[in-house]
Amino acid sequence: MALARCVLAVILGVLSEVARADPVLHSPLHRPHPSPPRSQHAHYLPSSRRPPRTPRFPLPPRAPAAQRPQLLSTRHTPPTISRRCGAGEPWGNATNLGVPCLHWDEVPPFLERSPPASWAELRGQPHNFCRSPGGAGRPWCFYRNAQGKVDWGYCDCGQGPALPVIRLVGGKSGHEGRVELYHAGQWGTICDDQWDDADAEVICRQLGLSGIAKAWHQAHFGEGSGPILLDEVRCTGNELSIEQCPKSSWGEHNCGHKEDAGVSCAPLTDGVIRLSGGKSVHEGRLEVYYRGQWGTVCDDGWTEMNTYVACRLLGFKYGKQSSVNHFEGSSRPIWLDDVSCSGKEASFIQCSRRQWGRHDCSHREDVGLTCYPDSDGHRLSPGFPIRLMDGENKREGRVEVFVSGQWGTICDDGWTDKHAAVICRQLGYKGPARARTMAYFGEGKGPIHMDNVKCTGNEKALADCVKQDIGRHNCRHSEDAGVICDYYEKKTSGHGNKETLSSGCGLRLLHRRQKRIIGGNNSLRGAWPWQASLRLKSTHGDGRLLCGATLLSSCWVLTAAHCFKRYGNNSRSYAVRVGDYHTLVPEEFEQEIGVQQIVIHRNYRPDSSDYDIALVRLQGSGEQCARLSTHVLPACLPLWRERPQKTASNCHITGWGDTGRAYSRTLQQAAVPLLPKRFCKERYKGLFTGRMLCAGNLQEDNRVDSCQGDSGGPLMCEKPDETWVVYGVTSWGYGCGIKDTPGVYTRVPAFVPWIKSVTSL
């Protein structure tokens, strides 16, 4: 009985719908929407009570069989006929309350769960026009209600579309193309006057396309053939439809089809970039998309090639790095650091970089860019992209040029401050520039692209200075050219507080990071301010470096006694250089001072390595010999009989000695562990005494040693108070970097009373 009642109720309901059907369209009579919530309909229940089921969609009414052929024969009708939306025409795309319809391809789950077979024609359709599936019933569409849920509603197509109908033409995909509007019965284009990304954002939103909206000009996707319908479109980017944007009247313009506007609505994927916070679309803070969130890029190691790649990926031809202070501040995450692009990347994340989110930066170091199209006349970096490599910061380094797909260097023949001025100008720096020669920032590894570059100092770019064929040279990488930009800023910060300089020892005022002699790497300028060198005067040769040394005060230097074995202890034969970094390039903090006195330990014998220690008094008046600065500071002495193996950590050796290939021109540094006394005794037997210590990394693949050119140089260790103490003087060893043969050093704590008695320190 219950089943019979249910069947009867269904039949009566169907008959009721047929009785209420419109005699012309055979569709349910019009009713306003959205209807007030009604508890009997699951679709309108509050979300907390709503069962997980498909909304009740408008099903086609069951018409008498005799009338069905008439329905099937209905053809597309013009928009002047009331309440008609042709099955293939772009008429209505909003509900009868003016709510925009969703695109049919945005709601496939609902279509898949809907029973009528005629609805299959709507699946995957990339438009939002109202439809009557199968030609039955009133046209309707999906929309999103006030609660953000997918709903459906009827359309009234009598006046054509409630929102302008838009399509993209000429692109490689449905996400890009020339913008065309349907108006007054025909398709037409938009003029690109004042067309920008804000306009593109509205177009993409109206088309239901998410992602990055970008405006394109000058008929980028080809010229249209219909009328030009709109001009001077000025959207803010927040509008739901282009109809809401300020614009010219329909059909009013002063353009040709060469100015047809286009857009691209690129899907958001990891690595997509944009410019944000600028006053126009071609400038701003560089931001990259990752895991659903935009973030910034740190400028550590940022080069002109990175700028070129970023601007090219954004659709521009050229660009320059800009101060991020010109753009709005950011509170977004810093996604990328140490980015390095080669110029061939098709995506920004193909550039070399740190892992996502790994950085040591603040937002003050965000990359800012200004990009320019080819037609703008703003080509600020013409010719060869350039970059600075292996400097202490982005304002200095070895000059490298990108030619024929490969980075290479410039030979320093004739290289002067005028050349440096041009390089720095091309990179966007305005301060004084200084040239550096003789591979001051290390030797490059690629080809040498240029030689005999001729600059007057007034050129805008390096390309204006090249007079010789690319690739033609007679140089080696030991002659690679470099520059320092904004030079005065570095110099004025270099003198420090006079009270601190005169009263302290063991202070490293300029070290910022540690790179790692054999197993070592270039140090930073001024990072080891007590490093000195003992040099022969020209009467005994070419003034070459003889030994390393350690500055103990303005007038006293510590070194090894064996340094005087060959040329004797005549003070007039030697000079001491402090504040040096590159042995062949004069620098502002460098001082070369004559020797007044040489004091060799009385127990030293030339045929032995014991007591291998000496003191050198510099020429000067009173206690003022070397001028102290951030690059010239004394080291601290240890306590008498102090055991560095127990009290010291973080030990380093420094010098200009053997690097494993040749003697270095730039100061080297290497971290070494202090080794147990018993190990050294077992290895060197009776040659190792209590006045010695040994240090070095003994692993086969990571051996670090101090070699011939570093004789007399310091072995420094850091104490808990962050001061540095000289615990050793480089003395002797078996070869350089040979397995199980650590370097041997004179143990300075054993000689503290002698040092103080000689120097009165």
From Swiss-Prot:
One of its GO terms (cellular component) is cytoplasmic vesicle. One of its GO terms (biological process) is exocytosis. Its EC number is 3.4.21.-. One of its GO terms (molecular function) is serine-type endopeptidase activity. Residues 26-88 are annotated as: Disordered. Residues 166-267, 273-373, 386-487 form the SRCR domain. Residues 54-63 have a biased composition (Pro residues). Keywords: Disulfide bond, Glycoprotein, Hydrolase, Kringle, Protease, Repeat, Secreted, Serine protease, Signal. Its main location: secreted. Residues 505-516 are annotated as: Zymogen activation region. The active site is at H562 (charge relay system), D612 (charge relay system), S711 (charge relay system). Disulfide bonds join C85-C157, C101-C141, C130-C155, C191-C255, C204-C265, C235-C245, C298-C361, C311-C371, C341-C351, C411-C475, C424-C485, C455-C465, C505-C636, C547-C563, C651-C717, C680-C694, C707-C736. InterPro entries: Kringle (IPR000001), Kringle-like (IPR013806), Kringle_CS (IPR018056), Kringle_sf (IPR038178), Peptidase_S1_PA (IPR009003), Peptidase_S1_PA_chymotrypsin (IPR043504), Peptidase_S1A (IPR001314), SRCR (IPR001190). PANTHER family: DELETED IN MALIGNANT BRAIN TUMORS 1 PROTEIN, SCAVENGER RECEPTOR DOMAIN-CONTAINING. This is Neurotrypsin. The gene is Prss12.
